[in-house]
């Protein structure tokens, strides 16, 4: 849907009165570029009032730089009127002509305007350009609605291919599961029985003495008699 179609005649007439009142302001009585009297055109995205001759040069710059509207012949949107009211020639030139020499010769409007807006020759470094943020957002939303934009729904998870399934199955078989087992308990999930280690008791003192005596007796040898008996 065209946003201009939503502007009623009553609202359009109200916008015209507001713009005419803005043109009566001392800062807006002259063209923002060539200083000619009684401008009847404007750049809605730059927020400045310009004369008919300069409006033609602005159109040649492209709508990405300057969007030209007639004060009385075109339909204005509420956010465009609000931006013109908040900016105007004085505030606009504070940005575009910040470093312009005081007595600069503006003999050629075409060359001057292109250097001013396309090249940004006299803009201070780090300066922030006045911009109709609300207008830019509303235009983007309107463009999305007109183009039938629909938010994307989350896509389903991709199914695994045959090769991927085989690889995953192999990895699950090879990789040992991380389990926490306790001694003497049965892990019902893994069906693994852990046998506890037997406890070894220290032998008492009597057994130690007995074993030492036995070992000592084993080491003793039987001595032969001093004289061997002979038998006839």
UniProtKB/Swiss-Prot annotation:
Composition bias, Polar residues: 206-232
GO terms, molecular function: GTPase activator activity; zinc ion binding
InterPro entries associated with the record: ARF_GAP_AGD5/15, ARFGAP/RecO, ArfGAP_dom, ArfGAP_dom_sf
Transmembrane segments: none
Domain Arf-GAP: 16-130
Zinc finger region(s), C4-type: 31-54
SMART domains in the record: ArfGap (SM00105)
Region (Disordered): 203-232
Domain of life: Eukaryota
Keyword field contains DNA-binding: no
Alphabetic keyword roster: GTPase activation, Metal-binding, Zinc, Zinc-finger
Stated role: GTPase-activating protein (GAP) for ADP ribosylation factor (ARF).
Protein name listed in UniProt: Probable ADP-ribosylation factor GTPase-activating protein AGD15
């Amino acid at each position: 849907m065209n946003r201009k179609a939503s502007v009623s005649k009553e609202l359009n007439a109200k916008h015209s009165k507001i713009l005419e009142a803005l043109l009566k302001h001392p800062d807006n009585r002259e063209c923002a570029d060539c200083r000619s009297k009684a401008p009847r055109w404007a750049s809605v995205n730059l927020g400045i009032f310009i004369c008919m001759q300069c409006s033609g040069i602005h159109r040649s710059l492209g709508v990405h730089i300057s969007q030209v509207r007639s004060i009385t012949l075109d339909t204005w949107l509420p956010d465009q009127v609000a931006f013109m009211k908040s900016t105007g020639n004085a505030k606009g030139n504070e940005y575009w002509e910040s470093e312009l020499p005081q007595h600069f010769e503006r003999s050629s409007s075409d060359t001057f305007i292109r250097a001013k807006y396309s090249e940004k020759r006299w803009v201070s470094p780090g300066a922030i350009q006045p911009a109709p943020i609300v207008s830019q957002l509303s235009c983007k939303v309107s463009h999305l609605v007109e183009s039938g934009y629909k938010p994307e729904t989350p896509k389903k998870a991709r199914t695994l291919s045959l090769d991927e399934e085989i690889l995953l199955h192999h990895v699950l078989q090879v990789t040992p599961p991380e389990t926490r087992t306790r001694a003497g308990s049965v892990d019902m999930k893994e069906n693994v029985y852990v046998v506890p280690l037997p406890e070894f008791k220290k032998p008492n003192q009597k057994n130690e003495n007995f074993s030492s005596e036995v070992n000592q007796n084993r080491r003793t040898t039987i001595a032969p008699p001093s004289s061997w008996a002979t038998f006839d």
